């Protein structure tokens, strides 16, 4: 029973959180311990002591007692605070730094601010920092820091501010004029020190007690309090000193009771007892007047205990310990860190209604299912509200109780009482009433959330449907492993059961697995076909795979969408055989088109002569849902963009794509069962010749290595530039050995036959790669550690049994054996070394990337798309104007090609310019009418000209956007594929002329682009913004749908073009980002997830001389930390003019940049004693010395006898382009007259500099010092030598250590120019790359291109070029890191991160220094890092948290304003009046699941018609129509009531299991007859609700008079839907009873059934996915007596008006039944007896026996309904079947066994022989093809009955509809006014 305190009233939302400091008064008022806690003891005589630490007033101590304050027991009493009065104030350790800051801002003596509040600077500060008290204190502190004299005050003269006030003058001015001490903190003490200017006052230093500080702070006025960034109401400065200490309630510090032992008190209690002891000691001593130093000691002690209560890990402070010696856990430690209060208990908690167990695979589940063990299903519950519709079912579950499955655990009454069914309650308690809740067991098709940690991206939690299975593990489909990153080696996963209908609705419509197939991270699928299925698909689709009749029969049984027709076998004689491709074609749903290649496709084939026939069958082509050629593999069924699954998702919607996964697996796996695939040792053995080749290759590699070693020994090896000899040698050896591995691997792979199982797996892509093959068969290859060969471990060898200095391959880790042959011990050892490195790397990387991801998420968690389309953070600051700069979401965009960018002018003109003058061509392309229309009109030519001009200008702007000729763009609406689809749908014959006028095309494209808007609004800025957002899309549309292409290439007809344009618009609208989408979290996950795939350490490029680049995780860290000192800063310097092309000139620039010191060009230096300048001791220098000293220009006597002789390296000098003169010049400039420097000629043999010291004039006379001097001279020369070598810059920029010059390796670094002919040409020009950066200086050098030169040091770019440049730079650097690993992340995520980092105009690092310095709420900041500091800060400044972010709301347990929570719903009270009352008289009789449809909103799937979705803006929420329906823009198929497979039905009814649908657990249960006619009005056709609930999306029962279809309804506004449209006329075969689609005996074909009308199942290319097929009567497993025909099956739902038994028009007893009934008035044409639809068909004619009032129905002659039929319980008397029973009411033609039309098994057949006696097939003579259907007259070539697509075998293809969708055939009929060229739909928008 729940306690009475739990109120049912909803809690108010917390609007904001105010932080502050508890004032002493407040602590006392709050406290329940009068007089404070004074005793350190807890108990006294076995009872808790009053005034002790376990004071009974503070809370409950054990389970038996009650609280003395609130009289609650343990569960009710929250605990109450006490307090301790401290004898002396002490500092609060959390606020001590703040205290010092405040002290430094106010006068030590008079507490006035050191700067007058009236100072204009202060006023400016207050203005600037409004609402940001933290900043205010910082500004004021900076202002006051320098002041040493108190001069505050009101009437102070501001002019005197900077003058020293006269010390003799009386201190006035309101301040006190005292000198201010400087205040310092040491440990827990503050010291004040006066440094005095006046001579008379001595310096003094005193310790400032907390009491003194408290006095100072107490006197700060409220006004100044505010200026100092505090708050007089919530946080006064003096409250930062502790005078009264709150004692936390007992609930916060519970004692642990050990049985038999004493209570173990909590750490906080221990600490508090220390404080009380110290406090009492101090009191006692003070009272007894002890010595001052004793009292000081006591105060210190108290101070220490109070400090360690709060924070016990202060640096430089002893820890407070327990007796056992482990440090106490202070309050700070409780809050901070991952396990702390904030992150451990508030941000993340353990939850109820969850389960966790091991996962195992099950290929027979659909991807959106999860197998749940029965034991778990019996334990987890879902609270279901009892309604009149489910009360019987619930009663049954309650009766079964908890012990049996399915049952229930609890009943929750409407007053909140819980009845536990485990403890056999009284039977009277079990009675249910409407409004009770039953917590029932989990059962099939309940929605749950499935999750695997680590949850790295949103696809790690997805919605699934339960499938209860035996045994104890979760079962899941194999395709789901990739998004979860799961495998079945013991992984465990979690399952969460949502507890409300709203949550379930969200899971179903947003979260369910099929909707997550595509990841926004890289706009490609995350799930593909994997493992054995992939191997099997590749095996099965090979050319030589044939399947016998028996096997085909067997396989088709596993295909739920099979339509009971065997396809034509491809081989008839000697026996019928089908190919694997044929079987696969049956699985492919709908109208899907695709061209891809197989993994082994040779590229040269595309240009070669065989490009059409593909000799190896490697070109995959799927056309119209048929696999025409090609072998499928991972490329077409894997997770790549543009794979079959991706296309299927985009074209046919998530639901079909989801089923497609399952169907592939069931069929293919069952084929694999009799094909088989096993791999053994035999598959790894190659033939002897291959082994010889391998041996040869390895031998050759070893010889090569020996040669290289030889060369290196003899110094013949030329070091590559930039590398030492040793590096060059290592690189060479490594290259030789790696080539050897690859070569042997190649020959090994070649030796494997087509039938090799290992190869089969590699080729299909399911497991393994070529490296694996070569390592298993040929050789394992070189083992590396840290990117180098195995290093020497000890004494110059790797292992003890190799000789010293062995550089050969074996001893340095080359493994020449294969895994098959086995490794030698030393090889094994090296292999283990390499492997160990990999493991360590992975482990370290996981931690690193995990932290990176957490920081990214915390930085961007609350960034969301708002309703104005902008992207903002939680504080409402603008991050982006449109998400991703184009306002589109990442899932629905694809890679497309911009056709115009790369073309040369000539081919551009040839392909895009429409040449009207070429008459022969025109006659071939257009019909005569069009040509006539064109020649008559003058504007036509102008329009075409204008179009051409527009294309040219488009091309120019594209070339500006993509200056390097990049033509791949990411845009919605894949035009090539859509055009292909159109050609299929409308059967475009490319050889016939088209009736589409070019003017029509131009206008159509123009209106289309006017309607594809991202930024609405007509002002200039909005228009410009929209132009920017949609420019690429516009260019793509204009170039693809230019008149020339549309007419000549595609030959689209007028209606095909109209359809295409409408389709593009719809898709474009669908691709827009939804408001409420949390794009920040998405972006963070999309970047964090690829980071886990990067390697941690940086491999240096082997070989070429190039700078080392930091890559991978370390570089990523540098970028997002914005590190000031990157590991490898570097500039890429592009050159201009001659320097770019001429290597010599480029070298000049290089020399000007590279920093050169004297050391770099010096060969050797020496110091000589050479006393005679003229006759030198070095004979080779004699010559040039003579030249110099013949005519000395200085006093030779001053020269020192010591000589520094520097010999320079000629090669390096010329390399650096230096001359001797330059160097001497530099020396002279540096040392001036003090040195004498002479040098020889630049062309001499040796370049020599001779340097001597010049002694000063006066020195030469001091003889006695001379000896010393000599000594000094040579030492001095030494110093000078060292200084010159290292510090003297000869040339270059100091920061740039080395410059590499090379030609660009990649196109991106080449200069791209556009030639005269308009082609792109990449010119390789010299470029320089540097180690070290100094951008400012480099940019100012001549010959440097200032535009393209860039740095990889982000901070530097910011300083030099500003914020916009740095934003681009961050994006470029991130991209470079990702691309190095071949990862692709959609631009929008990178852009969002860059924008978050730069939005405020400075760089915000993604670290605590960036994220926590933002203006976000304190709660959000404290949930990231520095928890306690942030909270203390917030308290000191009295911040308020506005509760707008995600973290804040989660901490408070509220729904954050995001996703579906970022808007409110309004109730339309008007509509409620039309709601259907459920009369109480129904009692329990009205039960079927179908009856659920009566209450409009009773199931989530029915609400859509009332929501704005009807404007088709958010198509992602109504599934199957998702995209196919999209093909009928705005057509009825969009009716959201086709919302999902289950939609009209009760939420868990799944068409795939009619037997188990909850509404019909068995024929025995729940008869549906609302007994009283009083209900009938509820079904009147005008009720707005019934339309929504009619399961048949667009079946004729939508009477046009229903408000939903009224022409004013927004969706159907255009005249097409007026009741006169052919939609409802007899030609509309989709609805005519003769339509073959509706086999009357199959419930699924009844026009009411959801599926039939669900457009996505309608038009499917190979009879797939029309679920109806599964139930057709011919299919053996659905005999008419099977329960799926039971009248309770929802297909006969009474709510569907056409069968509604209770609706007066059908009740046989009701007088209104006469044909003259007013109900049949022409107002409701679809029911009017004159409606040809109903009258022409025999079963509706009033004469038809169906209308007879007698119960002919049950005539025993009708075999179908004979009473013994098992499905009717054999009891004709059973209430359901009384002739009065409404569902057999004669009105319902369905049940008239005598109607010749409707009983295929009945002996009579209608004379027209519409249904051939076999019942299931429909002969071509069926009226379906009768000529009276004007459109498809047999004369029409396109639709001749023989047209293969319409073979009667393809039953669900209603041939009348080009799209094949029975739902909206008239839509596509070319004669339909809806598509007439004047159709309003496409001229003016349907608002």
From Swiss-Prot:
**Chain residue ranges for the region called Bridging helix:** 825-837
Query: Which EC main class describes this enzyme?
Result: transferase
Describe its PTM? The tandem 7 residues repeats in the C-terminal domain (CTD) can be highly phosphorylated. The phosphorylation activates Pol II. Phosphorylation occurs mainly at residues 'Ser-2' and 'Ser-5' of the heptapeptide repeat. The phosphorylation state is believed to result from the balanced action of site-specific CTD kinases and phosphatase, and a 'CTD code' that specifies the position of Pol II within the transcription cycle has been proposed.
Residue windows of the sequence repeats: 1579-1585, 1586-1592, 1598-1604, 1605-1611, 1631-1637, 1638-1644, 1671-1677, 1678-1684, 1685-1691, 1692-1698, 1699-1705, 1706-1712, 1713-1719, 1720-1726, 1727-1733, 1740-1746, 1754-1760, 1761-1767, 1777-1783, 1784-1790, 1791-1797, 1798-1804, 1811-1817, 1818-1824, 1825-1831, 1832-1838, 1839-1845, 1846-1852, 1853-1859, 1860-1866, 1868-1874, 1875-1881
Q: Which GO terms describe its cellular component?
A: mitochondrion; nucleus; polytene chromosome; polytene chromosome puff; RNA polymerase II, core complex
Q: Where in the cell is it found?
A: Nucleus
Where is Mg(2+) 2 annotated to bind? Answer: 487, 489
Q: Which residues bind Zn(2+) 1?
A: 67, 70, 77, 80
Catalytic reaction list: RNA(n) + a ribonucleoside 5'-triphosphate = RNA(n+1) + diphosphate
Record-listed cross-link Glycyl lysine isopeptide (Lys-Gly) (interchain with G-Cter in ubiquitin), residues = 1260
Task: Describe its assembly.
Answer: Component of the RNA polymerase II (Pol II) complex consisting of 12 subunits.
Miscellaneous comment as given in the Swiss-Prot or TrEMBL entry: The binding of ribonucleoside triphosphate to the RNA polymerase II transcribing complex probably involves a two-step mechanism. The initial binding seems to occur at the entry (E) site and involves a magnesium ion temporarily coordinated by three conserved aspartate residues of the two largest RNA Pol II subunits. The ribonucleoside triphosphate is transferred by a rotation to the nucleotide addition (A) site for pairing with the template DNA. The catalytic A site involves three conserved aspartate residues of the RNA Pol II largest subunit which permanently coordinate a second magnesium ion.
Q: Any domain commentary?
A: The C-terminal domain (CTD) serves as a platform for assembly of factors that regulate transcription initiation, elongation, termination and mRNA processing.
The protein's role, per its UniProt record: DNA-dependent RNA polymerase catalyzes the transcription of DNA into RNA using the four ribonucleoside triphosphates as substrates. Largest and catalytic component of RNA polymerase II which synthesizes mRNA precursors and many functional non-coding RNAs. Forms the polymerase active center together with the second largest subunit. Pol II is the central component of the basal RNA polymerase II transcription machinery. It is composed of mobile elements that move relative to each other.
The protein's name: DNA-directed RNA polymerase II subunit RPB1
């Amino acid at each position: 029973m729940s306690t009475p305190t739990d109120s049912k009233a909803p809690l108010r939302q917390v609007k904001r959180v105010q932080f502050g400091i508890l004032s002493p008064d407040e602590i006392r008022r709050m406290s329940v311990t009068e007089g404070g806690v004074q005793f350190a003891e807890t108990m006294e005589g076995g009872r808790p002591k009053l005034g002790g630490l376990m004071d009974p007033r503070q809370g409950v101590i054990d389970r038996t007692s009650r609280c003395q304050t609130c009289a609650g027991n343990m569960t009710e009493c929250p605990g109450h605070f006490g307090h301790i009065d401290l004898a002396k104030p002490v500092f609060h350790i959390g606020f001590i730094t703040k205290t010092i800051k405040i002290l430094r801002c106010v006068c030590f003596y008079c507490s006035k601010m050191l700067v007058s509040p009236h100072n204009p600077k202060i006023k400016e500060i207050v203005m600037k920092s409004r609402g940001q008290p933290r900043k205010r204190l910082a500004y004021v502190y900076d202002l006051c820091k320098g002041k040493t004299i108190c001069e505050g005050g009101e009437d102070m003269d501001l002019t005197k501010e900077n003058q020293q006030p006269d010390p003799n003058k009386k201190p006035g001015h309101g301040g006190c004029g005292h000198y201010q001490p400087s205040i310092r903190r040491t440990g827990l003490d503050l010291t004040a020190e006066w440094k005095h200017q006046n001579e008379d006052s001595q310096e003094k230093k005193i310790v400032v007690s907390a009491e003194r500080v408290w006095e100072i702070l107490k006197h700060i006025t409220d006004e100044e309090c505010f200026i100092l960034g505090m708050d007089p109401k919530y946080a006064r400065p003096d409250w930062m000193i502790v005078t009264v200490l709150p004692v936390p309630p007992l609930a916060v510090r519970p004692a642990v009771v050990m049985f038999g032992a004493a209570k173990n008190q909590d750490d906080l209690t221990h600490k508090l007892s220390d404080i009380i002891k110290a406090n009492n000691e101090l009191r006692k001593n003070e009272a007894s007047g002890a010595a001052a130093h004793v009292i000081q000691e006591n105060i210190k002690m108290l101070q220490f205990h109070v400090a360690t209560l709060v924070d016990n890990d202060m640096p430089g402070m002893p820890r407070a310990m327990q007796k056992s010696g482990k440090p106490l856990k202070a309050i700070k430690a409780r809050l901070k860190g991952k396990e702390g209060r904030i992150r451990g208990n508030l941000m993340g908690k353990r939850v109820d209604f969850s389960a966790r167990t091991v996962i195992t695979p099950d290929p027979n589940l659909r991807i959106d299912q999860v197998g749940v063990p029965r034991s778990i299903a019996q334990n987890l519950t879902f609270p279901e509200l009892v309604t009149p519709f489910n009360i019987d079912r619930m009663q049954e579950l309650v009766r079964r109780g908890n012990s049996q499955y399915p049952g229930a655990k609890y009943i929750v009454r409407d007053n909140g009482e819980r009845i536990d069914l485990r403890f056999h309650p009284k039977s009277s308690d079990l009675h249910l009433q409407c409004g009770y809740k039953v917590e029932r067991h989990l059962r099939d098709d309940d929605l749950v959330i499935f999750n695997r940690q680590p949850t790295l991206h949103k696809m790690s939690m997805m919605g699934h449907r339960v499938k209860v299975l035996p045994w104890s593990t979760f079962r899941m489909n194999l395709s789901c492993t990739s998004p979860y990153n799961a495998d079945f080696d013991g992984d465990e996963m979690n399952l969460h059961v949502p507890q409300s209908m709203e949550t379930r609705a969200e899971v179903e419509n947003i979260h369910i697995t099929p909707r997550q197939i595509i990841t926004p991270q890289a706009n490609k699928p995350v799930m593909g076909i994997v493992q054995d299925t992939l191997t099997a698909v590749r095996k099965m689709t090979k050319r030589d795979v044939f399947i016998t009749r028996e096997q085909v029969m067997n396989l088709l049984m596993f295909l739920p969408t099979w339509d009971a027709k065997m396809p034509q076998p491809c081989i008839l004689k000697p026996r019928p055989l089908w190919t694997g491709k044929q079987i696969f074609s049956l699985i492919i749903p709908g109208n899907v088109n695709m061209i891809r290649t197989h993994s082994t496709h040779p590229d040269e084939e595309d240009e070669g002569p065989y490009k059409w026939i593909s000799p190896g069958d490697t070109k995959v082509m799927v056309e119209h849902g048929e696999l025409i050629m090609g072998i499928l593999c991972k490329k077409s069924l894997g997770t790549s963009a543009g794979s079959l699954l991706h296309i299927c998702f985009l074209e046919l919607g998530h639901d079909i794509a989801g089923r497609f996964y399952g169907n592939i697996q069931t069929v293919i796996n069952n084929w694999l069962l009799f094909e088989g695939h096993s791999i053994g040792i035999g598959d790894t053995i190659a033939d002897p010749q291959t082994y010889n080749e391998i041996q040869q290759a390895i031998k050759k590699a070893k010889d090569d290595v020996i040669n290289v070693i030889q060369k290196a020994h003899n110094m013949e090896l030329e070091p590559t530039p930039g590398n030492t000899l040793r590096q060059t040698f290592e690189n060479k050896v490594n290259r030789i050995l790696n080539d050897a591995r690859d070569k042997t691997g190649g020959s090994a792979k070649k030796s494997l036959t087509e039938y090799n199982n290992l190869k089969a797996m590699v080729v299909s892509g399911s497991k393994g790669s070529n490296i694996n093959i070569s390592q298993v068969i040929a050789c394992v290859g070189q083992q590396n550690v840290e990117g180098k060969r195995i290093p020497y471990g000890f004494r110059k060898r790797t292992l003890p049994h190799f000789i010293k200095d062995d550089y050969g391959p074996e001893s340095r880790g080359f493994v020449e054996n294969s895994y098959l042959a086995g490794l030698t011990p030393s090889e094994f050892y090296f292999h283990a070394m390499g492997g160990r490195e990999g493991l360590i790397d992975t482990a370290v990387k996981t931690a690193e990337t995990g932290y990176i991801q957490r920081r990214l998420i915390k930085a961007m968690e609350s960034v969301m798309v708002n309703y104005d389309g902008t992207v903002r953070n939680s504080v409402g600051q603008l991050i982006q104007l449109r998400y991703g700069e184009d306002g589109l979401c990442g899932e629905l965009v694809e890679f497309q090609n911009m056709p115009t960018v790369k073309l040369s002018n000539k081919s551009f003109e040839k392909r895009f310019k429409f040449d009207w003058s070429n008459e022969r061509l025109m006659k071939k392309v257009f019909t005569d009418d069009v040509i006539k229309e064109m020649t008559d009109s003058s504007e036509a030519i102008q329009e075409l000209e204008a179009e051409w001009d527009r294309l040219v200008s488009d091309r120019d702007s594209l070339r500006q956007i993509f200056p390097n000729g990049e033509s791949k763009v990411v845009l919605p609406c894949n035009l090539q594929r859509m055009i292909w689809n159109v050609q299929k749908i409308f059967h475009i014959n490319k050889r016939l002329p088209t009736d589409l006028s070019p003017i029509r095309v131009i206008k159509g494209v123009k209106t289309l682009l006017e309607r594809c808007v991202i930024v609405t609004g007509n002002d200039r800025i909005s228009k410009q913004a929209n132009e920017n957002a949609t420019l690429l899309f516009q260019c793509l549309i204009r170039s693809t749908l230019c008149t020339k292409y549309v007419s000549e290439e595609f030959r689209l007809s007028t209606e095909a073009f109209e359809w295409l344009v409408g389709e593009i618009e719809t898709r474009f609208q669908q691709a827009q980002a939804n408001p409420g989408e949390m794009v920040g979290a998405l972006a963070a996950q999309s970047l964090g997830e690829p980071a886990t795939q990067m390697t941690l350490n940086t491999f240096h490029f082997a070989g070429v001389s190039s700078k080392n680049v930091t890559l991978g995780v370390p570089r990523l860290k540098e970028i997002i930390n914005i590190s000031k000192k990157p590991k490898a800063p570097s500039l890429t310097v592009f050159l201009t003019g001659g320097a770019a092309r001429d290597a010599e000139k480029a070298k000049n620039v290089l020399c000007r940049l590279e920093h050169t010191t004297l050391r770099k060009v010096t060969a050797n230096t020496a110091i000589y004693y050479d006393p005679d300048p003229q006759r030198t001791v070095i004979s080779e220098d004699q010559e040039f010395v003579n030249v110099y000293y013949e005519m000395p220009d200085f006093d030779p006597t001053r020269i020192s006898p010591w000589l520094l002789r520097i010999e320079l390296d000629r090669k390096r000098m010329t390399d650096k382009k230096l001359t001797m003169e330059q160097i001497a010049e530099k020396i002279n400039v540096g040392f001036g007259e003090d040195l004498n420097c002479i040098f020889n000629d630049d062309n001499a043999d040796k370049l020599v500099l001779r340097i001597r010291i010049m002694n000063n004039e006066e020195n030469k006379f001091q003889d006695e010092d001379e000896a010393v001097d000599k000594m000094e001279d040579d030492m001095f020369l030494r110093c000078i030598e060292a200084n010159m070598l290292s510090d003297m810059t000869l040339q270059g920029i100091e920061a740039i250590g080395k410059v590499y010059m090379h030609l660009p390796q990649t196109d991106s670094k080449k200069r791209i120019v556009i030639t005269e002919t308009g082609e792109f040409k990449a010119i390789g020009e010299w470029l320089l790359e540097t180690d070290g950066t100094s951008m400012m200086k480099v940019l100012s050098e001549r010959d440097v291109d200032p535009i393209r030169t860039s740095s990889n040091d982000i901070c530097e770019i910011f300083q030099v070029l500003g914020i916009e440049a740095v934003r681009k730079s961050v994006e470029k650097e991130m991209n470079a890191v990702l691309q190095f690993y071949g990862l692709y992340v959609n631009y929008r995520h990178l852009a969002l991160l860059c924008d978050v980092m730069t939005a405020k105009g400075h760089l915000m690092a993604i670290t605590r220094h960036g994220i926590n310095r933002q203006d976000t709420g304190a709660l959000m900041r404290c949930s990231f890092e520095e928890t306690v500091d942030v909270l203390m800060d917030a308290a000191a400044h009295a911040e308020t948290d506005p509760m707008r972010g995600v973290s804040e709301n989660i901490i408070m347990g509220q729904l954050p304003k995001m996703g579906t929570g970022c808007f409110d719903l309004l109730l339309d009270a008007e509509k409620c009046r039309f709601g259907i009352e459920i009369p109480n008289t129904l009692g329990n009789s009205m039960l079927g699941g179908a009856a659920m449809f009566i209450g409009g909103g009773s199931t989530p799937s029915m609400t859509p018609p009332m929501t704005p979705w009807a404007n088709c803006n958010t198509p992602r929420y109504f599934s199957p129509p998702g995209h196919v329906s999209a093909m009928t823009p705005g057509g009825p198929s969009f009716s959201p009531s086709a919302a999902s497979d289950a939609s009209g039905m009760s939420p868990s009814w799944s068409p795939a299991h009619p037997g188990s649908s909850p509404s019909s657990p068995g024929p025995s249960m729940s008869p549906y007859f609302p007994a009283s006619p009083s209900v009938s009005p509820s079904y009147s056709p005008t009720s707005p609700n019934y339309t929504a609930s009619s399961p048949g999306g667009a079946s004729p029962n939508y009477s046009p008079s229903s408000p939903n279809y009224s022409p004013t309804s927004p969706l159907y506004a255009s005249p097409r839907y007026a009741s006169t449209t052919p939609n409802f006329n007899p030609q509309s075969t989709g609805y005519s009873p003769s339509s073959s689609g509706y086999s009357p005996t199959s419930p699924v074909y009844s026009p009411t059934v959801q599926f039939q009308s669900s457009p996505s199942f309608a038009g499917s290319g190979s009879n797939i996915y029309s679920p109806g097929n599964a139930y057709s009567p011919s299919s053996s497993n659905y005999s008419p007596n099977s329960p799926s025909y039971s009248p309770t099956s929802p297909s006969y739902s009474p709510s569907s008006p056409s069968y509604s038994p209770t609706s007066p028009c059908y009740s046989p007893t009701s007088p209104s039944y006469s044909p003259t009934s007013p109900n049949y008035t022409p107002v409701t044409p679809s029911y009017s007896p004159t409606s040809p639809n109903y009258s022409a068909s025999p079963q509706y004619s009033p004469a038809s026996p169906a209308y007879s009032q007698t119960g002919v129905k049950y005539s025993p002659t009708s075999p179908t309904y004979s009473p013994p039929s098992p499905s009717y319980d054999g009891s004709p008397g059973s209430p359901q079947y009384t002739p009065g029973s409404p569902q057999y009411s004669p009105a319902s033609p369905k049940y008239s066994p005598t109607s010749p039309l409707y009983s295929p098994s009945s002996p009579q057949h209608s004379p027209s022989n519409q249904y051939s006696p076999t019942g299931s097939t429909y002969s071509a003579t069926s009226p379906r093809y009768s000529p009276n259907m004007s459109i498809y007259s047999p004369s029409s070539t396109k639709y001749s009955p023989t047209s293969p697509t319409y073979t009667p075998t393809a039953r669900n293809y209603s041939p009348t509809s080009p799209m094949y969708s029975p739902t909206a055939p008239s839509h596509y009929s070319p004669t339909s006014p809806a598509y007439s060229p004047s159709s309003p739909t496409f001229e003016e928008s349907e608002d």
